[in-house]
Amino acid sequence: MVLGRGLLGRWSVAELGAVCARLGLGPALLGSLHHLGLRKSLTVDQGTMKVELLPALTDNYMYLLIDEDTKEAAIVDPVQPQKVVETARKHGVKLTTVLTTHHHWDHAGGNEKLVKLEPGLKVYGGDDRIGALTHKVTHLSTLQVGSLHVKCLSTPCHTSGHICYFVTKPNSPEPPAVFTGDTLFVAGCGKFYEGTADEMYKALLEVLGRLPADTRVYCGHEYTINNLKFARHVEPDNTAVREKLAWAKEKYSIGEPTVPSTIAEEFTYNPFMRVREKTVQQHAGETEPVATMRAIRKEKDQFKMPRD
């Protein structure tokens, strides 16, 4: 689907969203809106910690993490470096740090260019395949972005070196944040390219699932609607799934992100976080959480997405 600039000049983003939703063209709309610069960014002010969501490529997110106390900033997965530099300048912050969740091109592919644009950046990641890497981290490694504390969480499965970054402001009541790359999505999880169901179970339930319930979840892609359609298939009577899906469709229709969620919310509608629930196990025909994880991931990989 191609949307001409003349069409965009006559219709608002919301009107285009409504038309494409009626025609079952949601994914095409999102890609088109992005390429014409209309997929919206969002700034989440959590207190001292500020997070700007930067749409990238077709459905990726980069995240500018800002410490308001020191005006120091980090960027998560900067696949479009020029956009990152311009956004940092807009906020008047000093970009010091790159937090790379994993080595895939749509997350790490901008690292080399960014370090040329901004010499002296510290580039963190858990995999030697990450471009421009200066600081290799492991599980529970820590670092600072200004006054913000960052803890590295190893979550191998999507890739063997995948890291999630858990960010807190010490001695502050503001909620934490976790940048989950392609491990945890809103209502979903990443494909098991280099790992197993057991590893994803540990990543979701034993690592991320044990973070504070109010932790904001900033994931790597805008996959929420399709994830919730699968969640609805798994648990058709789950009210939380249906309510979140209706909300996400509304956000999508006006070009707004569905991120962040929270850890607490994910336990109510994400089937991969709910593999200990009897309803999910019964759908999978299993009685054990890891086997359920394996079964529903295999099913989702082959799932024909409804067009509603």
UniProtKB/Swiss-Prot annotation:
Binding positions for substrate per the UniProt entry: K191, F192, Y193, H221, E222, Y223, R297, K298, E299, K300
Cofactors (names): Zn(2+)
Protein name per its UniProtKB record: Hydroxyacylglutathione hydrolase, mitochondrial
Top enzyme category: hydrolase
Residues the record lists as N6-succinyllysine modifications: K229
Keyword Mitochondrion listed: yes
HAMAP family reported in the protein's UniProt record: Glyoxalase_2
Residues with PTM N6-acetyllysine: K116, K229
SMART domains found in the cross-reference section: Lactamase_B
Record family assignment: Belongs to the metallo-beta-lactamase superfamily. Glyoxalase II family.
Pathway of action: Secondary metabolite metabolism; methylglyoxal degradation; (R)-lactate from methylglyoxal: step 2/2
Source organism phylogeny: Eukaryota, Metazoa, Chordata, Craniata, Vertebrata
Keyword Plastid attached: no
